[in-house]
Amino acid sequence: MKTYRRQLREKIIQALYTLELRDVDTDSATNWLLTKEMADDPNAMKFFNHLMKSIIDHREEIDRHIAKHTFNWDMNRIAIIDKNILRMALAEILYCEDIPPKVSINEAIEIAKKFNSTEKSSKFVNGILDAIFNDLKAEGRIQKCGRGLIDHTESKMQKSESNR
């Protein structure tokens, strides 16, 4: 079974862009984007639908996190593509328990490079996501399950130092 996650993330960005610019429902914005191969893959569709639903259902919360870290920017001034890349990555970090945060951030950076809405999109996306991730981690909001999903290096080092 082929993994389509990068392509699905790109399709999600395209769907979010369509939703932002046109008065259409989610199905209309997404159905034409998916290849038959993707649509026929239950795992691909599960990932796609879960991530789309998470972005839409939690958009206000996600946007609050973005606004908190873009205090010099009005949300309406952030490029639509960049804003939706941030939304997608944050939804993944917060609501996809099986995806490591570093993967979500890296995928967002790579997609920002590909879509390249501005010259500095990838750096902007990286900086904002890194700041939000650090806040969420400090607040204990990152809930991941499975090995390697959260970098526990700092906490291991702190435990090691306290045992001396």
Curated annotation (Swiss-Prot):
Domain of life (superkingdom): Bacteria
GO molecular function, one term: RNA binding
Keyword terms, alphabetized: RNA-binding, Transcription, Transcription antitermination, Transcription regulation
GO annotations of cellular component type: cytosol
GO biological process terms held by the UniProt record: DNA-templated transcription termination; transcription antitermination
Disulfide bridge positions per record: none
Pfam families referenced in this protein's UniProt entry, alphabetically: NusB (PF01029)
Keyword RNA-binding: yes
UniProt xrefs under InterPro entries: NusB-like_sf (IPR035926), NusB_fam (IPR011605), NusB_RsmB_TIM44 (IPR006027)
Statement: the UniProt record of this protein carries the keyword RNA-binding: yes
Function: Involved in transcription antitermination. Required for transcription of ribosomal RNA (rRNA) genes. Binds specifically to the boxA antiterminator sequence of the ribosomal RNA (rrn) operons.
Family classification: Belongs to the NusB family.
Protein name: Transcription antitermination protein NusB
Species: Chlorobaculum parvum (strain DSM 263 / NCIMB 8327)
Gene: nusB
